Amino acid sequence: MDEVDDILINNQVVDDEEDDEEMLSGLENDSKQDLEGNDDGGEDEEDDDDDDEDDDDDEDEREDDDEQEDDDGEDDAARMDKTATPTNEHQHDEQKAAAAGAGGAGDSGDAVTKIGSEDVKLSDVDGGVGSREASSSTHEASANGEVYEYYKHMLNAAQIADSYNIYPTAAIPIQTHVNALAVSRGLKYLFLGGSDGYIRKYDLLNTLEGKLSLTILQKHSLAESIQNAGILQSYWENEIPQKKSEMKLSANKTDYEPKVSPVHSLEVQSECLFILSGLQNGGITMQGVRYMEGSIAHYFKGRNGHTQIVNILRLNGQEDRFLSGSWDKRLLEWDLQTGDIVNEFKKSRSELSSLEMRPLYSSVDVSGNVNSGKENENADDDMDSLFGDEDEDEKQDAGNEPVETGDGSNGEENKEQISEESLNIVYDESVFMTSGLNGSVHIWDRRMTQSPALSLERGAGVPPWCLSACWGVDGDHVYAGRRNACVEQFDLKMPSKPIHNLKLPSISGPVSCVKAMPNNKHLLCASRDNIRLYNVEIAVDASNSTTKSSKVPFLIVPGHHGGIISNLYLDPTSRFIISTSGNRGWQGNSTDTTLIYDIDLE
């Protein structure tokens, strides 16, 4: 064993000596290379510098990698802390208590917890979503408020204008009679109903902005100012609901042929949640617009519903009830919540042709109207409820709530003229007016459903015909278009006969539509040849023999010519007018064109 140990020790000594010799030889070689590098003039120094730069770059890359790993480590630690924080409720409560006791959570009083290496407010972590929702709702409310203020400003400007310059800018060619129109909130969509049985939806805003132009052939017969075309978005049938036994099924027994009715009336909810459409069989359909477009959600018919064409539909301000008029001489009020008839206004003596709610702020005196009512043999003996008699509140229908009548004595002074929710004109919904084909014009009170509150009889020599009637902006006057090219003006203070007769040129034909302008001085009168903007004051002076004026009482609005005007729509700000052409199921021809006009205030 001793010999073996001596051999191992000697081998170890020999190995150590060999290592020392190799080290000495390496040092000698290095010194020789240094001397040779100095003799070469520093050529190798440049190589060494390059090597040093490469080494520096490598070191920088390693440092960046180390920093990235440190950041990843911190992120992982933060995620682990965040994950661990909600799971350990006891530690979470201790952290909140410690943070609250240490610094009072800053000036704002919010508790602070430490997540990872950062101090975060618990209110920011827990309530971030709620704060974002609150800020978005606040922003939306402020935007709606700005639009509402703009609408009021434009309406006030239109009310004090001396005159209006009306000119057409857009046209929608439709090869059918357009009997009805409806416009959604903020002029977003335009709905047109035709005698071909289709409801068409147009993008009205982009149409007004001129996003689509008419073709050369379409411009050929139109005024030069008309350049824009209507942007059609969709269309669908005005379908009449059928029983399963009455359906005509196809060969595969899965499809059926729909029964389509001409569209005689339309009324859309302000947010386009639904649209009401009148049918030829006396029914009324509620159809989806924003959701399930064109599908029928409800069918208003019932045993006591209309039996003939429904040509009038009007939603109330709350959009929970609507009025319907028909060729069966009946005027009904429906509840959208239950789908039932809540009121029937009786003793309507003719097919209804138009219906309008009364404007706010009527200045009619109570005693003056009562006296005039006694002198009028054709009017009702009791007219007090029309002008706010409190004793009539007990006689109102059980389904109705008491409503202010709209005269100044009933506290209507503070009511805004435009609704902030729907951006539509606010009316006095307790009083409305209807016109009939026999020439009758009736004033109705919602609390008197047994008969009209007032009946405005036509003047001597006027034929029994009236397609359209409208209120004056003041709520005291009514204008009725007649067949013999004239418009009769009625005053509620003297309802027994018309106070003025505004005559149009005899060649103009019957007056098919009238619309009062917001300054209470001008009236739009649509007849077969043209649309005229009448100055009522000048027209009255011209008709008076003692104060006869040489001024022409009207201006011709360019665009329309040679057809029956079925509707005139004036937007709440009085910036635009929409006219449709159609005979509404009666006599007359159509121009097959819907025109959109711009209004400039003067």
Curated annotation (Swiss-Prot):
Disulfide bonds: none
Domain of life: Eukaryota
Bias kind Acidic residues: ranges: 14-23, 36-75, 378-395
GO biological process terms on file: chromatin organization; negative regulation of transcription by RNA polymerase II; positive regulation of transcription by RNA polymerase II; regulation of transcription by RNA polymerase II; ribosomal large subunit biogenesis
GO annotation, cellular component aspect: nucleus; PeBoW complex; preribosome, large subunit precursor; SAGA complex
Residues bearing PTM Phosphoserine: S108, S123, S131, S451
Molecular function as annotated in GO: TBP-class protein binding; transcription coregulator activity
WD repeat segments: 173-212, 305-346, 415-454, 506-544, 560-600
Alphabetical UniProt keywords: Nucleus, Phosphoprotein, Repeat, Transcription, Transcription regulation, WD repeat
Annotated segments matching region Disordered: 1-141, 366-418
Phosphothreonine found at: T85
Subcellular location: Nucleus
Leftover remarks: Present with 8430 molecules/cell in log phase SD medium.
Subunit comment: Component of the 1.8 MDa SAGA (Spt-Ada-Gcn5 acetyltransferase) complex, which is composed of 19 subunits TRA1, SPT7, TAF5, NGG1/ADA3, SGF73, SPT20/ADA5, SPT8, TAF12, TAF6, HFI1/ADA1, UBP8, GCN5, ADA2, SPT3, SGF29, TAF10, TAF9, SGF11 and SUS1.
Family classification: Belongs to the WD repeat SPT8 family.
Its job: Component of the transcription coactivator SAGA complex. SAGA acts as a general cofactor required for essentially all RNA polymerase II transcription. At the promoters, SAGA is required for transcription pre-initiation complex (PIC) recruitment. It influences RNA polymerase II transcriptional activity through different activities such as TBP interaction (via core/TAF module) and promoter selectivity, interaction with transcription activators (via Tra1/SPT module), and chromatin modification through histone acetylation (via HAT module) and deubiquitination (via DUB module).
Protein's UniProt name: SAGA complex subunit SPT8
Native species: Saccharomyces cerevisiae (strain ATCC 204508 / S288c) (Baker's yeast)
